[in-house]
C-alpha cells in the first residue's frame, strides 16, 4: 500500500518513525512544507490554503491514503482536505483521543494539552476530550518549541529555558500530557524529565504520542497488520530545501 505523510516540516518524522517501526506500508511519500513552517502561528484561512496545496502535491503520486501528520492542519484543515479528496485522509487528533480512551479510565484525571497557538486556539482537543467525558482538561500553547526543533535544538540550556518559561507557572501537575504537535515527541524525554524533576515525581506523566496513536488507529480502522514490510520505499519532498530535509531524516530516523 502506497501512502503519503504530510507535515509543515520535520515534526511529521515522529509519525513516520512510528509507521516505519510498525512496518505497515510498502511505500511512503513524505512531504514537508518546510518553506512555510511553522503553521501554528498562521490564521485558519492560510492553514487551509497551504493544506489544500499539499493535497495537490500528492495527486500525481497516486497514493491510497494520506496521513496529515500535523496537529495544526488536522485541527483546522482536515475536513476541508477530505471534501476535496477521493482517497481517505487521516489526521492525528482522533487517534490521540482514542489512545486517551484506552489508557485513561478516570474521567477526572488532570490532562494537559500542549500545542501550537493555532491548535490550542481551535479548541479541537478540548472539545473532543469533553465529548468523551473528560472533565479536568487544560491547555498550553508552546509554539516556541517548533522553531527550536526545526533547528535541531533538542537539548541544552536554550530548550531548558523554554520549558521553564512554559511549565514553571503551572500550579497543578498533569497526570497525562498530550503532545499536540508532531514536533513535540522529538523532545518527549526532555519534557518528561522536566516534570519529574521540577514536580518531585516518583511516576512520570503519561505522554500521548500521536505517532504511536495513529499506528493503533490505522490497524483498527483498516485492518492493517504489523511487521509486513520490513524495508519500505521512502521518498522525501519539500517546498523548501529537500536535501536538508533528507539529512534531518537520516539523523533522526537513522535511515
Swiss-Prot record:
Claim: Nucleus is one of the keywords in the record: no
Positions contributing to substrate binding: 7-8, 39-40, 71-72, 182-183
EC number in record: 5.1.1.3
Keywords: Cell shape, Cell wall biogenesis/degradation, Isomerase, Peptidoglycan synthesis
UniProt catalytic activity: L-glutamate = D-glutamate
Active site: 70, 181
GO MF annotation terms: glutamate racemase activity
Alphabetized Pfam families for the sequence: Asp_Glu_race
GO biological process: cell wall organization; peptidoglycan biosynthetic process; regulation of cell shape
Broad enzyme group: isomerase
Cited InterPro entries: Asp/Glu/hydantoin_racemase, Asp/Glu_race, Asp/Glu_racemase_AS_1, Asp/Glu_racemase_AS_2, Glu_race
Biological pathway: Cell wall biogenesis; peptidoglycan biosynthesis
Family: Belongs to the aspartate/glutamate racemases family.
PANTHER family: GLUTAMATE RACEMASE
UniProt function note: Provides the (R)-glutamate required for cell wall biosynthesis.
Protein name: Glutamate racemase
Organism, as annotated: Helicobacter acinonychis (strain Sheeba)
